Curated annotation (Swiss-Prot):
Subcellular location(s) per record: Peroxisome
Region spans: Disordered: 40-60
Tissue occurrence: Expressed at high levels in the kidney. Also detected at very low levels in the duodenum, jejunum, ileum, heart, liver, lung, and brown adipose tissue (at protein level). In the kidney, expression seems to be localized mainly to the proximal tubule.
Name the UniProt record assigns to this protein: Enoyl-CoA delta isomerase 3, peroxisomal
Keywords: Isomerase, Peroxisome
Catalytic activity reported: a (3Z)-enoyl-CoA = a 4-saturated (2E)-enoyl-CoA; a (3E)-enoyl-CoA = a 4-saturated (2E)-enoyl-CoA; (3E)-nonenoyl-CoA = (2E)-nonenoyl-CoA
Organism: Mus musculus (Mouse)
The keyword Isomerase is annotated on this UniProt entry: yes
Keyword Chaperone: no
Family per record: Belongs to the enoyl-CoA hydratase/isomerase family.
Ranges spanned by the short sequence motif Microbody targeting signal, renumbered to the chain: 315-317
InterPro entries membership: Acyl-CoA-binding_protein, Acyl-CoA-binding_sf, ClpP/crotonase-like_dom_sf, ECH/Chromodomain_protein, Enoyl-CoA_hydra/iso, Enoyl-CoA_hydra_C, FERM/acyl-CoA-bd_prot_sf
Residues binding substrate, per UniProt: 120-124
Taxonomy of the source species: Eukaryota, Metazoa, Chordata, Craniata, Vertebrata
Length: 317
């Protein structure tokens, strides 16, 4: 097997896997190699997204559930077997759901997750593709990301996150654009961007220093410190922390109370709170996406992503 190019993620990881297992006894190495390659190859089974436009109409998706009841629109990450990792289609579905929620009869909009995780963030398999298509994949990814974040910047109603478990990456950074964040005491908040050679997103390079101060923001965004729910509350990212045993009951009782408040007053108040910052947020979002677009095609990024996939697959053995 010839050595593959740096952006042929699955084949390159397979190459590394074969070399890494070379020191094991022959039969053990053979079995482990087959298991590892099978795991890596499953990463590439999803249909290619590289040529799909970000303005494509979102399809109905079982991975994003949208319900509306008692004045509350609930948007649920519903991919528990993948720790609610966000696929390309889920990004489109969320944008579609937010557009509908902005004009429906609900008073507030709530995000939460199914299962143990709130969301493990961007599904890195979104960026696995053939070497010849990497530029298209990166361009599409950053275009969708910019539109996705702008949807949160523009959303006119109160936006609440009900963080039922661990949150990673963009599932954390986007929280700074919410109006309230309620967390279970078992939730954690992790932004391992430097580990993955990625640029922070969702206006976090501006909002995190504003919320928690520059040194604490750097601890998360540069050095990848994982925060407990209590630490996130102390730093201002989380509004309130609830015991896991009473989390759902207490939070939803609170939310039903919020849904009885004046919708017009809350919309006007949110507009006044956000209006002086909105243009700044658009600018920061554009700058972060431009930096990501410039960064992603580099070999260092490809190597970090490849190593992540290799470690993840090897851990399953």
């Amino acid at each position: 097997m010839p050595k593959p190019g740096v952006f042929n993620f699955v084949n390159k990881a397979t190459w590394d896997a074969r070399n890494a297992l070379g020191s094991l006894p022959k039969e053990t190495a053979r079995k482990n190699y087959v298991d590892l390659v099978s795991s890596l190859s499953s990463s590439s089974e999803a249909p290619s997204q590289g040529k799909r436009g970000a303005d494509e109409k979102a399809r109905e998706s079982k991975d994003i559930l949208v319900t509306s009841e008692d004045g509350i629109t609930k948007i649920t990450f519903n991919r528990p077997t993948k720790k609610n990792a966000i696929s390309f289609q889920m990004y489109l579905d969320i944008m579609h759901a937010l557009k509908n929620a902005s004009t429906d009869n609900s008073v507030i909009t709530v995000f939460t997750g199914t299962g143990d995780y709130y969301s493990s963030g961007n599904d890195l398999k979104n960026l696995i593709n053939d070497a010849g298509e990497i530029q298209d994949v990166v361009a599409t990814s950053t275009k969708i990301l910019r539109e996705f974040v702008n949807c949160f910047i523009d959303f006119p109603k109160p936006l609440v996150a009900v963080v039922n478990g661990p949150a990673v990456g963009i599932a954390v950074t986007i929280l700074a654009l919410f109006d309230a964040v309620f967390a279970s005491d078992r939730a954690t908040f992790h932004t391992p961007f430097s580990q993955l050679s990625q640029i922070p997103e969702a206006c976090s390079t501006y909002m995190f220093p504003k919320i928690m101060g520059p040194t604490k923001a750097a601890e998360m965004l540069l050095f990848g410190k994982k925060l407990t729910a209590r630490e996130a509350w102390a730093q201002g990212l989380v509004t309130e922390v609830f015991p896991e045993s009473t989390f759902e009951t207490e939070v939803w009782t609170r939310l039903k109370t919020y849904s009885k408040l004046s919708p017009n007053v809350m919309r006007i108040s949110k507009e006044l709170i956000r209006k002086h910052e909105k243009q700044k947020l658009y600018t920061v979002n554009a700058e972060e996406c431009a930096a990501a677009l410039e960064r992603m095609p580099r070999e260092e990024y490809a190597k970090a992503l490849r190593n992540f996939l290799f470690r993840k697959a090897k851990a399953k053995l």
